[in-house]
Amino acid sequence: EGAWVIALSHSPRPQAQTAMDEAQEWVRWSCGDERQLDSTLNRVDVLLLNHGINPGGDQSPETLSKTLEVNALSHWRLIQQFETIADQDQKREEPRELWVNTSEAEIQPALSPGYELSKRLIGELVSLRWNNRTATQRQALRLRKLILGPFRSNLNPIGILTSGFVSRQV
């Protein structure tokens, strides 16, 4: 309650069915252009990274490169950016928070090898990064890694959980 929701998306703003389904602000961006989000990220208290693509069985070099870029490397750049912002503003009353939704593919096999590889990579990078932050840095930024389970979505059309069930658990 009382949150101002900013959506960062590659896609145009969808038509919301109700006001509750809609972000108050919609910012379009593309992988590789993370720096253009600096002014927006400076206003964010809680950043939730949840983007990705699922290439299915396509393992061509081009598809694997795109999957790694979208699912892992773009996340990594945004994590570093948000860390820098938090580190420069350590006097805040409340720490910033960074939530990274990796995937159940981080802990169990996925039908898509490229998806599994990319999600495991970002999961490992998040763990590695968190272990290298000082106590002072950890006080300025809370980092949370989410592994939500196999819920049905555009990325996982055969998921066994509903997104509503998973969201209630968080």
Describe each region flagged by the PLM.
Residues A7-A16, C31:
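N-terminal Rossmann-fold cofactor-binding loop
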Residues G52, T67-F82, S118-K119:
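Short alpha-helix in the Rossmann-fold core of NAD(P)-dependent oxidoreductases
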Residues G57-N71:
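Short alpha-helical oligomerization interface
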Residues N156-R168:
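A conserved structural motif in NAD(P)-dependent oxidoreductases
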Residues E1-I6:
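Canonical Rossmann dinucleotide-binding motif of NAD(H)/NADP(H)-dependent dehydrogenases/reductases
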Residues T18-R35:
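Rossmann-fold cofactor-recognition segment
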